[in-house]
């Protein structure tokens, strides 16, 4: 499911040549959230952080895609022994942006509270897909979840996306690894700008202006 949109050049038939816009095809029935019949678009790399022994380590994440056929974003990176893929739909992205906005407002007003992150004190909790594996993300769950929290480290507040361990939907008796992805306020603002729907649509429109014209 993770890699279904990759390496499939020619597998979707588009009738939009000459129209100036990408028209929905039969694939729209497969993905109700269909945006355009266009291959995944690589987004600008962003920086996040992992936490190890209470020390933050910067992650430069360049495998970052928008998939117009499903209106999902896919984020690939390594975490420990695992190669991970995190998949977010539009509702989850909007929830992250809303949570990030609240976090930044409270950070600027110095009103954030130093408390252990839990689902109860999360800014937002939502659904996602998580795939993982040693070499490639071969195992996965389409029923994953995440929580957007604040966590203080060395006296400073950071925004953290927490992904609880979840039973895989691709195999039995296998659970996803618990994962956390941290952001400083500056890193968070850039990430949220990347995942805003209007900015993703602008990417699609730019590709369509070159691909679906006579």
Where are these regions (language model features)?
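Positively charged, low-complexity terminal tracts
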Residues: 2-214
